[in-house]
Amino acid sequence: MVITIDGPAGAGKSTVARKLAQRLGFDYLDTGAMYRAATWKLLQADPDDCSAEEVARIVAETDIRFSGKGPDRRIMCDGRDVSGEIRTPRVTRNIYRVADEPAARKPLIEAQREIAGRRNLVTEGRDQGTDVFPDASVKFYLTASRRERAMRRLQDLQDAGHDVSLEEMVEQLARRDHEDNSRPVGALRKEDDMEVVDSTGLTVDETVDRMIETIDRECPDAISKSERRAGK
């Protein structure tokens, strides 16, 4: 069973997906981390001098995998733990070099589908319910007001030691929203078969509770109450 969570940057997709997976006893797939790891690897070269074919080759030849579970889960790139290095503003600014290139996206999407074929999964990203898993059992579109999203992202960056103001973050998210909605491939789209969850003013647990209500309604026999309790 695959549950997808799509939505704009800063909506809390990773945090909510992680908690939802824990509650359900499912595995969690952070597809954004995979794109960030591929971008980090690309930045070890000179991306400005790389053709589209070279970008695709670098991504295809990069070994990206997850290690560990829960809060100790790390993302490895060619055997190196890059969990912290992929969260820098420089990586964020350059993700488009991988995410907007169809040939570079292909091996990442194939890897995501391979992972989903082996387990029950909660997966989040920008195109999970549209391009990667269009037949997912339940699809969510998680959003929040831009200001709230900016405050969440600001806290993450400040915790990581980056000095950014709230006004700068709001402007960055406005640009990111425009970019994500107008990307040539893998654009952020809200489809009719997605359940919209607005997390503005909600805690993570409250957001997850709303999602579980939807899962119970749409797939009543998929997850037993005992399994859900075990996941808490």
What would you call each of these model-derived segments?
Residues I5:
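Hydrophobic anchor at the beta1->P-loop junction of P-loop NTPases
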Residues A9:
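The conserved Walker
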Residues K13:
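Conserved lysine of the Walker
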Residues V16:
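Hydrophobic positions on the alpha1 helix immediately C-terminal to the Walker A/P-loop
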Residues Q22-R87:
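N-terminal phosphate/diphosphate-binding loop that engages ATP/GTP or pyrophosphate donors
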Residues G32, G79, L108, V122, ...:
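Residue-level signal for inorganic ion chemistry
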Residues S67, Q112-R119, R126-D131, D135, ...:
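Small-molecule kinase domains that catalyze NTP-dependent phosphoryl transfer to phosphate-bearing small molecules
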Residues S83-H162:
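ATP-dependent NMP and nucleoside kinases share a basic, alpha-helical "lid"
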